[in-house]
């Protein structure tokens, strides 16, 4: 039943913030996983924090969520370039739930630095970010995507949207990032939609994924 599934989910979340599973220096935060046993937690990851926030974790425990977001702004684990987008998205998703403007102002310099890092990996010539790794498994290169994995492109597009909203909220120039987000959205629609397959493939036109009609 739905109630049973909810209780299982809450039990998993309780372990994810449990001190028994936390790594040193990461107590009171959302860990990416507790499956390795007591004292052997998986740690606080940028990508996994983003995924939890996109699924509403901020409503469950706002204090733990804030602590986690502030942590990944300065630290946090990641394997690939998607970790940059994940941090910016996490900040905005937390704000949407909390309206905690104090966090934005307190960490404004660090947030702007993360936004700048996102822009630094953006290729203005093709309107995409070089992303050899898909976000669903960013420990292994997605060779079929031809260096431009769809999921990571989508996260960067949304990260630029979040950057626009964050900067606007704290009174900083923001319009530039709205333009970047729109440019990425256009390129994703143009390059990844495979009309024969009727899907967005995990790589753009010209990649193995596009040719073989592979969906991530």
What are the residue ranges of the model-derived segments?
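Conserved helix-loop functional segments at active or binding sites
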Residues: 15-19, 61, 93-96, 120, ...
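The feature captures the catalytic groove of carbohydrate-active enzymes
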Residues: 77-82, 116-182, 186, 193-216
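Generic detector of bulky aromatic hydrophobic side chains
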Residues: 10, 14, 50, 114, ...
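Substrate-binding groove/exosite segments of carbohydrate-active enzymes
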Residues: 1-105, 201, 206, 210-216
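Extended, well-ordered alpha-helical scaffold segments
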Residues: 4-9, 61-74, 101-119, 163, ...
């Amino acid at each position: 039943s739905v109630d049973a599934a909810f209780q299982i989910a809450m039990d998993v979340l309780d372990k994810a913030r449990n001190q028994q599973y936390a790594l040193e220096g990461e107590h009171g935060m959302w860990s990416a996983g507790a499956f390795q046993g007591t004292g052997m937690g998986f740690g606080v990851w940028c990508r996994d924090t983003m995924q939890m926030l996109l699924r509403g974790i901020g409503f469950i425990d706002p204090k733990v969520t804030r602590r986690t977001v502030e942590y990944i702004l300065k630290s946090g684990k990641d394997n690939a370039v998607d970790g940059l987008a994940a941090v910016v998205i996490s900040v905005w998703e937390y704000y949407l739930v909390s309206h905690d403007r104090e966090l934005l102002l307190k960490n404004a310099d660090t947030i702007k630095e993360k936004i700048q890092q996102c822009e630094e990996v953006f290729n203005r010539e093709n309107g995409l970010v070089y992303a050899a790794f898909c976000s669903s498994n960013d420990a292994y290169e997605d060779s079929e995507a031809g260096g431009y994995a769809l999921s990571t492109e989508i996260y960067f597009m949304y990260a630029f949207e979040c950057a626009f909203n964050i900067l606007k909220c704290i009174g900083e120039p923001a319009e530039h990032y709205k333009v970047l987000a729109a440019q990425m959205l256009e390129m994703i629609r143009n390059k990844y939609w495979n009309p024969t397959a009727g899907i967005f493939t995990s790589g753009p036109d010209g990649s193995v994924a596009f040719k073989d009609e592979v969906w991530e």
